[in-house]
A protein has these predicted regions:
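FIC/Doc superfamily catalytic core
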Residues: 1-267
Length: 267
């Protein structure tokens, strides 16, 4: 039977929603987190949880199989093809991140920045950080709220404030005022966590999940990404920051690909 999200069940078969919710919430395969989720314009809060399912396990297996296939393919491709593959992947990732953030870009523009042909104030920081995943063997620290703020300052803060000075951070570490997330039509669909003290509290919980060795990596990074976006610690640049951190943690598991990348970018 195909897995259905609770939101789908709520709208398709509302009479089954509560029963399914409690079954999943109380399942022996469910992991609970000290994190309360409250939907926009909803009165009640609900404790966050992650229910391991057969579909999730099968999906992880498929992903790891594709990873193995990729490693085997990279063993036989010419260095020039590998270089073009890594360049194309990096360009696609930066462009996808920009598109999600609503920043118009072209593959040509980003490729020129990645290749060092031109310097772009809009993309220089994000490109430099993504290239550092391949060229720098030093570990990045994403263990504390201070680490997240320090990374954001290098990665996105300057570009964010250049685009809109009102988005400059005004709290001790994160934003002090409220922030809203809107749909393409302009409708508010979420408000970030407030006050800053609560942001710090929940982000600490989120970082603990990200670094929990007792959970599968793919589950950890997916949960981290969702909770980080829910918290929304910055006025702008939350999506690109979370996406980079996820990319970094996934890349750390692909040592062979990273080693090849370092050889190419340092050549």
């Amino acid at each position: 039977m195909e897995y259905e999200s609770l939101s789908k069940i709520y709208y398709k078969r509302p009479a089954e929603h509560n029963k399914t919710y409690f079954e999943r919430f109380n399942s022996p395969l469910t992991r609970h987190f000290d994190f309360q989720i409250q939907g926009y314009n909803h009165r009640n809060k609900h404790p966050a949880f992650f229910c391991y399912t057969e579909e999730f396990t099968v999906l992880m297996e498929k992903i790891y199989k594709k990873h193995e296939d990729l490693l085997q393919a990279l063993q036989v491709v010419p260095p020039l093809v590998l270089e073009q593959f890594i360049l194309s992947s990096l360009v696609d990732e930066v462009r996808a991140t920009s598109d999600i953030e609503g920043i118009h870009s072209t593959r040509k523009e980003i490729k020129e920045v990645v290749s060092g042909i031109v310097q772009s104030a809009r993309f220089s920081s994000i490109v430099a950080k993504y290239k550092s995943i391949l060229t720098d063997s030093a570990l990045m620290q994403f263990k504390t709220c201070e680490d997240i703020r320090a990374f954001y300052d290098e990665f996105a803060h300057k570009e964010v404030t250049a685009n809109d000075p009102t988005h400059k951070l005004d709290g001790d570490l994160f934003r002090r005022d409220s922030v809203s997330i809107t749909s393409p039509s302009g409708k508010i669909i979420h408000r970030g966590v407030q006050p800053e003290k609560k942001i710090v509290e929940l982000l600490n919980v989120t970082l603990e999940i990200l670094h929990n060795p007792d959970m599968p990596l793919l589950a950890r990074v997916a949960i981290f990404h969702y909770l980080f976006e829910y918290i929304h610690p910055f006025y702008d640049g939350n999506g690109r920051t979370a996406r980079f951190i996820v990319s970094y943690f996934l890349a750390r598991c692909c040592w062979q690909i990273m080693d090849w990348g370092r050889v190419i970018w340092k050549a």
